[in-house]
């Protein structure tokens, strides 16, 4: 009842925020603000993406892609997934690595996959709005829901402050384990707000998995170096988790500390560092002793972009992100890249 009463207020607020954004595009210079249409055109001209920026896929589809993959036919192979997150990586950040064949995203494309324009922040903006921030972005990916959904099934994490309610939609890790599609899952992060504290984003998911004896591991570290190392060890372990997700903070840290811009050397280096770590993880997957008998879905994506030294509003530079995968997944339809099994 209260939600229904406050809904018109939220829509009006979102409208005025959008108006402020538009005014900012018109009056603020310096290259950080670009009119939405111009920014999308710039993304299209990069030659990086397999879909138009105007046709960006919603962030919600990541969950559906992963679930569909595990539920699909793997030709007798064991399904496994590695999801690598670049926190705070704008879509146009990939300009800095598009000519590097050893960059993580380029390796996935070379394996028969693709790189897609994707968006965060809710759709449509006035109805399903959520901050273009860390907690809402990743939560949308692992639940397949925006924070606010008309039917009341949203995950409720509008910004970085709240926990997902205990009665909210289940995260992909829980779903895979309960459906017996995965034996073990492991979620590894460098930002402790995900898992630590009374208001941790996933506190109720962690409790649910523990109460129900589900083999879900949740690990936070003190640095991206440690997150990378733990993820590498998990991927190299013959008995490691079937679903592994890690989040690297290089880009977000560089953006907040300097600026979210390709003219900022530290931000450029951050995307290169992310791509380097991703490439090493991809190599580790392919080096697994049982790799030929496994079917791996590997995804690299981001939770949000940024402008100046922040994010959260509905700026195009904050909303437009990307999804790279070793399989073509546009529209949530997986195209297998598996070679036939040779006896």
How would you label these PLM feature ranges?
Residues 81-83, 91, 101-109, 273-315, ...:
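Metal-dependent active-site segment of extracytoplasmic phospho-/sulfohydrolases and closely related
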Residues 87-92, 122-126, 131-133, 146-148, ...:
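Solvent-exposed loop/turn segments at secondary-structure junctions
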Residues 148-220:
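Catalytic-site neighborhoods of secreted/periplasmic enzymes
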Residues 136-144, 313-343:
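Substrate-binding rim/cap in mid-to-C-terminal beta-strand-loop elements of soluble/periplasmic
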Residues 1-36:
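Membrane- and interface-active hydrophobic/amphipathic segments that mediate membrane binding, fusion
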Residues 37-78, 90-180:
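Active-site nucleophile/metal-coordination loop of metallo-enzymes that catalyze phosphate/sulfate
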Residues 195-206, 232-280:
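Active-site His/acidic residue clusters
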Residues 77-82, 111-116, 179-186, 238-246, ...:
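Loop/turn elements at helix/coil->beta-strand transitions in domains of secreted/extracellular proteins
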């Amino acid at each position: 009842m209260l939600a229904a009463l406050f809904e018109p207020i939220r829509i009006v607020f979102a409208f005025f925020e959008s108006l402020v954004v538009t005014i900012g595009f018109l009056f603020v210079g310096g290259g950080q603000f670009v009119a939405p249409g111009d920014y999308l055109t710039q993304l299209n001209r990069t030659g990086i993406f397999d879909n138009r920026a105007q046709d960006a896929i919603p962030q919600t589809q990541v969950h559906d892609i992963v679930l569909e993959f595990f539920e699909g036919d793997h030709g007798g192979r064991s399904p496994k997934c590695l999801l690598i997150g670049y926190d705070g990586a704008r879509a146009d950040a990939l300009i800095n690595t598009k000519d590097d064949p050893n960059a993580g995203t380029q390796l996935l494309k070379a394996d028969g996959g693709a790189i897609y324009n994707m968006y965060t922040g809710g759709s449509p903006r006035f109805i399903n709005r959520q901050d273009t921030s860390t907690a809402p972005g990743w939560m949308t990916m692992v639940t397949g829901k925006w924070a606010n959904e008309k039917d009341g099934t949203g995950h409720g994490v509008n910004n970085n402050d709240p926990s997902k309610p205990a009665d909210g939609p289940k995260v992909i890790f829980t779903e895979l384990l309960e459906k017996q599609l995965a034996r073990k899952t492991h979620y590894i992060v460098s930002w402790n707000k995900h898992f630590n504290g009374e208001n941790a984003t996933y506190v109720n998911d962690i409790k649910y998995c523990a109460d129900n004896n589900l083999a879900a591991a949740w690990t936070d570290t003190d640095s991206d170096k440690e997150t990378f190392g733990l993820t590498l060890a998990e991927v190299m372990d013959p008995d490691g988790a079937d679903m592994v997700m890690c989040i690297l903070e290089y880009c977000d840290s560089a953006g907040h500390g300097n600026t979210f811009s390709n003219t900022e050397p530290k931000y450029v280096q951050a995307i290169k560092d992310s791509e380097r770590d991703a490439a090493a993880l991809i190599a580790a997957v392919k080096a697994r002793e049982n790799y030929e008998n496994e079917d791996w879905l590997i995804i690299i994506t981001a939770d949000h972009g940024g402008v100046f030294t922040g994010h959260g509003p509905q700026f195009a530079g904050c909303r437009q992100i990307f999804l790279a995968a070793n399989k073509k997944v546009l529209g949530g339809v997986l195209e297998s890249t598996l070679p036939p099994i040779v006896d």
